[in-house]
Amino acid sequence: MRYKNLQNALQQLLELGVVPIVNENDSVWVPELVGAFGDNDELSALLATAAHADWLLLLTEVDGFYVPTGKHPKLLRTVRKLTPQMEELCNGHGQLGTGGMRSKIRAAKTASEGGVHMAIVNGRHAHAILWSIARKIGTYFPPRRRRS
């Protein structure tokens, strides 16, 4: 029921031309929801899915999702299926926030399962938004299912 209410509220805002900015740490935090979302990455994926967004871009301080390959980690450009091993590669928190890569991977799973295109991209890149949608930078997570 809460998800449906959230979805309806978002839809009404979008129809009015309002782009809602939601931060779990501020406007929607209530004691009853502690642990419900985890952090803003996961909350953004839930909101993108509820709003039937086409895209979710997570802007961060790294170029995307890296995996170890010997001396130098490899940037994955496209991740079609997330595995438990991929999530295990992620630990710790980012320098600019509390979620770290693990929460971004969880958000990618939620978004892609909800039919939303998702990318993790370095927000300091001059063309971060346009180039991530064009898949020139970052890590892209295609939707795993089509929305009805």
Give the label of every model feature segment:
Residues 1-148:
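C-terminal catalytic "cap/lid" subdomain
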